[in-house]
Amino acid sequence: MKTFTAKPETVKRDWYVVDASGKTLGRLATELARRLRGKHKAEYTPHVDTGDYIIVLNAEKVAVTGNKRTDKIYYHHTGFVGGIKQATFEEMIARRPERVIEIAVKGMLPKGPLGRAMYRKLKVYAGTEHNHAAQQPQVLDI
């Protein structure tokens, strides 16, 4: 019996919608990364993008445990000398709540072209509205 290898053109990708309100950030991001990679499918192949599309709603209502709301710090660099910037979890949620989930999930995906293709299938929205109704997403309870 030969080993099965999924072909990119034959992979069936479904659309799912997830409500992030009240969910713990790390536990939610772990499951999202797993589904974006396609590890929940029987035809999972490491070098082929077999994952599904995922829409995340209510990103501003995601929860963190302990004192991370005030203690967790996100860093980025502008590229200029002395251009390191930082923001706490609270500031990120106030300014751009979608980025919190995007950063958490992106760090759990593979680095390189395949990981970037998986990351593009993640759609995160701060509120309850999204513009993917035409794809008829199924509700995914995590």
From Swiss-Prot:
Q: What is one process in the GO biological process aspect for this record?
A: translation
Q: Can the keyword Ribosomal protein be found in this entry's annotation?
A: yes
Pfam families given in the database record:
Ribosomal_L13 (PF00572)
This protein's source sits in the domain of life called Bacteria
| Keywords, ordered alphabetically | Ribonucleoprotein, Ribosomal protein
Gene3D superfamilies found in the cross-reference section: Ribosomal protein L13
One of the record's GO molecular function terms: structural constituent of ribosome
Q: Gene Ontology cellular component?
A: cytosolic large ribosomal subunit; ribosome
**Could you tell me which NCBIfam families the record lists for this protein?**
rplM_bact (TIGR01066)
Protein family per UniProt: Belongs to the universal ribosomal protein uL13 family.
Known partners and oligomeric status: Part of the 50S ribosomal subunit.
Function, as annotated, reads: This protein is one of the early assembly proteins of the 50S ribosomal subunit, although it is not seen to bind rRNA by itself. It is important during the early stages of 50S assembly.
**What's the protein called, per UniProt?**
Large ribosomal subunit protein uL13
Q: What is the lineage of its organism?
A: Bacteria, Pseudomonadati, Pseudomonadota, Gammaproteobacteria, Enterobacterales
